[in-house]
Amino acid sequence: MGDLPGLVRLSIALRIQPNDGPVFYKVDGQRFGQNRTIKLLTGSSYKVEVKIKPSTLQVENISIGGVLVPLELKSKEPDGDRVVYTGTYDTEGVTPTKSGERQPIQITMPFTDIGTFETVWQVKFYNYHKRDHCQWGSPFSVIEYECKPNETRSLMWVNKESFL
């Protein structure tokens, strides 16, 4: 086991396929558990891109709402301070969220040697045939996290979450 990094910075990007289209969110205020809702389309594929700093960290998969997404090492950035992984998240078979409701979905990413990153996204899954609803709101390119691994190397505390 190597040294425990003081801070881990990671970003998760989602792009709807096949055209690498943007994913949207809307600000719901305090009506639900979280103030932001990510809008996803059922029956669709999303490219997942995870960037991690420091570049010595390794992951093999990310679980999005219980769906295991294998991650493949894509590259280390030229300056060598971040590593990039990609995978595909498929919403085939996911039930659309009822009108006026939101779904909390668990996000977990186990890191080799330093513990598991965990967070919850508030999501609304839209029926594939109502895809125009999925494009209202604000597009985001990435969700960035600043995390601190705990001393037992079991999990990471999320200090900050930013939609960019």
Curated annotation (Swiss-Prot):
It comes from Homo sapiens. GO terms for cellular component: cytoplasm; GABA-ergic synapse; glutamatergic synapse; plasma membrane; presynapse. GO terms for molecular function: type 1 cannabinoid receptor binding. The lineage of its organism: Eukaryota, Metazoa, Chordata, Craniata, Vertebrata. This is CB1 cannabinoid receptor-interacting protein 1. It comes from the Eukaryota. Interacts with the cannabinoid receptor CNR1 (via C-terminus). Does not interact with cannabinoid receptor CNR2. GO terms for biological process: negative regulation of signaling receptor activity; regulation of signaling receptor activity; regulation of trans-synaptic signaling by endocannabinoid, modulating synaptic transmission. Pfam families: CNRIP1. Belongs to the CNRIP family.
